Curated annotation (Swiss-Prot):
Keywords: Endoplasmic reticulum, Lipid metabolism, Membrane, Microsome, NAD, Oxidoreductase, Steroid metabolism, Transmembrane, Transmembrane helix
Domain comment quoted from the record: The C-terminal region plays a crucial role in controlling the activity of RDH16 and its required for endoplasmic reticulum (ER) retention.
Name the record gives this protein: Retinol dehydrogenase 16
Residues bound to substrate: S164
UniProt organism field: Homo sapiens
Induction / repression: Transiently up-regulated by retinoic acid.
């Protein structure tokens, strides 16, 4: 009996391995639009897909970022400046994409643009702090997607949304985790709706990687600005030791960040060119072995773990 079971399991994984490695043909005819290509995942993915031969349409926030990217890629790659928080900028970029792809449609849309700041305990933040992140990470994703869906549907293509392990388990305050939970929900509903048209939707859920989003210097600068503007009552409740512990946790976070960004961009590439893409991709060992399992744990257990490892306020009970 155990032999039959072992054979069955072996055949299952062999079939899974084979399906995972089937790649689409005619990649050179397929257009992919990527947001957030100034640096990090977006920039590396644009270079990676360009080397693969795909027609990359790269959106950068700044002209400087676009110029740098063009200098590192082939003449086939084209760039456009895009601020995902401004509807008029999104509309202009969508029109540009439409002119580029013409009747072929848009094979791939990668919503990669994102920010992580301001981040701090919720009580220290304002409504505008939440809006700042949600405008980019969630509403920007929605605006870009809705503007380009007709082109993706025409090509029966792919939508790839960059979420995070923090879209599976919320470990700190501020708009970042909220925005990623929103991306997960938007992607789930979008996947079901677009399945009728042959369009596939995938989510990338990276762990901690060394990018501008996880920059210790930016994180600490933002946090100290938030702390300085906080009310005396809040400062008294949290205390200076909390600030010191928060700084220390930021430094530890940066040390734990994975530097190999290709672990994420390879997932993005697979979602775009595989015959059988996954629905979700957990990128990084911390995502696979720590945060993803945490998302399935009982809530009380996750709360207990976070209570134990997080900085403690001065007036904690």
């Amino acid at each position: 009996m155990w032999l039959y079971l072992a054979v069955f399991v072996g055949l299952y994984y062999l079939l899974h391995w084979y399906r995972e490695r089937q790649v689409l043909s005619h990649l050179r005819d397929k257009y992919v639009f990527i947001t957030g290509c100034d640096s990090g995942f977006g920039k590396l993915l644009a270079r990676q897909l360009d080397a693969r031969g795909l027609r990359v349409l790269a959106a950068c926030l700044t002209e400087k970022g676009a110029e740098q990217l063009r200098g590192q890629t082939s003449d086939r790659l084209e760039t456009v400046t895009l601020d995902v928080t401004k509807t008029e900028s999104v509309a202009a970029a969508a029109q540009w994409v439409k002119e580029c792809v013409r009747d072929k449609g848009l094979w791939g849309l990668v919503n990669n643009a994102g920010i992580s700041l301001p981040t701090a305990p919720n009580e220290l933040l304002t409504k505008q702090d939440f809006v700042t992140i949600l405008d980019v990470n969630l509403l920007g994703v929605i605006d870009v997607t809705l503007s380009l869906l007709p082109l993706v549907r025409r090509a029966r293509g792919r939508v790839v949304n960059v979420s995070s392990v923090m879209g599976r388990v919320s470990l700190f305050g501020g708009g970042y985790c909220i925005s990623k939970y929103g991306v997960e929900a938007f992607s789930d509903s979008l996947r079901r709706e677009l399945s009728y048209f042959g369009v596939k939707v995938a989510m990338i859920e990276p762990g901690y990687f060394k990018t501008a989003v996880t920059s210790k210097e930016r994180f600490l600068k933002s946090f100290l600005e938030i702390w300085d503007r906080s009310s005396p009552e809040v400062k008294e409740a949290y205390g200076e030791k909390f600030v010191a512990d928060y700084k220390k946790s930021a430094e530890q976070m940066e040390q734990k960040c994975t530097q190999d960004l290709s672990l994420v961009t390879n997932c993005m590439e697979h979602a775009l060119i595989a015959c059988h893409p996954r629905t979700r991709y957990s990128a990084g060992w911390d995502a696979k072995l720590l945060y993803l399992p945490m998302s399935y744990m009982p809530t009380f257990l996750v709360d207990a773990i976070m209570y134990w490892v997080s900085p403690s306020p001065a007036k904690a009970l």
